[in-house]
Amino acid sequence: MIKQRTLKNTIRATGVGLHSGEKVYLTLKPAPVDTGIVFRRADLDPVVEIPARAANVGETTMSTTLVNGDVKVDTVEHLLSAMAGLGIDNAYVELSASEVPIMDGSAGPFVFLIQSAGLEEQDAAKKFIRILREVTVEEGDKRATFLPFEGFKVSFEIDFDHPVLRNRTQSASVDFSSTSFVKEVSRARTFGFMRDIEYLRKHNLALGGSVENAIVVDEDGVLNEDGLRYEDEFVKHKILDAIGDLYLLGNSLIGEFKGFKSGHALNNQLLRKLIAETDAWEVVTFEDASTAPISYMRPVAAV
C-alpha cells in the first residue's frame, strides 16, 4: 500500500518574509493521518489554524495567501511545493509572523529541512486526486488547464517581453515519472525585475527581497554574481510555484497541469473549478505500490 506520510521529527528554521521584510521563525511538526498541511499562527493567542486548501486562498498578488477571518499567512507556495515534491501528506507549519520565510527564493531549503526531519509512513492509504477530463480556465491570453495523464506532469510557458528573458528558454515540461523534483525543479528561485522593485516597495511588497533570495534582472542581464542555477530557471520556478499552488487540492495529483502565463490567481481559479466539477476527478488509493503511476513521490525511503 502507498501510505500517507508525515515528518519523523520536529524541525525549526529562521528566515525573512519576502514581502514583509520581517524575521520569521518557522517550525515544521508531524501531524496525524488525514490532517493535511495546516498552517498555525503561533504568534497569536489563541493560535489560529489555516488548512492549506484552495478554499482558504484569500489573496494572490505576487504570492499565494491563505486566510482565516482577518488572519493570514502569505507566500505559502514554495514550502507547499517542497511538501508536494517529497510526498508529505500531513504536517503542522507553525509561524511567528504572517509570512512563510523566503529562504533563498526556491523550495530547496524547505526540501533540506523536510529531509533533515526525516519522513515517516503512517498507517493509512495515501489519497491521490486523478484527473478524469480536461478542465480549463482562461483570463485574457492567460490559461491554466488540467488534463488526464497517467502520472504527474507539469508544462508551463511564460512570455516576458524583456531583453534578458527573450533569449532564454520560456517553456518547459516536466514529467515526474522520469525527472527528480529535488534535482530539477526545487532549486529554481523566484525572480524580479529592477524596474518593478521601486513600485513594489512603495506598496510595501518585496521589502525583504534581495539577490540573496531572488534572481534580480535589469535591462542588461542577471545581477546575481553566481548567475542562474538552471538555464531555464525562470520557467522552472513557475513550475515550482504551480506545484505548490496545486497542492492546495489537499492531495497529490495524477494528471497533467498546463500553464500559459498563468499565475497564483489563475492557478487558484483552476483548482476551484476542478473541485466544483465533481465528474472531472476521483480520489484513488493504491493497495499495491507497483500499480501506481507516480514514482516521484518516493525520492527518499520513509523510515
Swiss-Prot record:
Gene3D superfamilies: lpxc deacetylase, domain 1, lpxc deacetylase, domain 2. One of its GO terms (cellular component) is membrane. InterPro entries: Ribosomal_Su5_D2-typ_SF, UDP-acyl_GlcNac_deAcase, UDP-acyl_GlcNac_deAcase_C, UDP-acyl_N-AcGlcN_deAcase_N. This is UDP-3-O-acyl-N-acetylglucosamine deacetylase. The active site is at 264 (proton donor). Pathway: Glycolipid biosynthesis; lipid IV(A) biosynthesis; lipid IV(A) from (3R)-3-hydroxytetradecanoyl-[acyl-carrier-protein] and UDP-N-acetyl-alpha-D-glucosamine: step 2/6. It catalyses: a UDP-3-O-[(3R)-3-hydroxyacyl]-N-acetyl-alpha-D-glucosamine + H2O = a UDP-3-O-[(3R)-3-hydroxyacyl]-alpha-D-glucosamine + acetate. Catalyzes the hydrolysis of UDP-3-O-myristoyl-N-acetylglucosamine to form UDP-3-O-myristoylglucosamine and acetate, the committed step in lipid A biosynthesis. GO terms for biological process: lipid A biosynthetic process. The keyword Lipid biosynthesis applies. Belongs to the LpxC family. Its EC number is 3.5.1.108. Coiled coil: none annotated. PANTHER family: UDP-3-O-ACYL-N-ACETYLGLUCOSAMINE DEACETYLASE 1, MITOCHONDRIAL-RELATED. It holds the Pfam family LpxC. Its cofactor is Zn(2+).
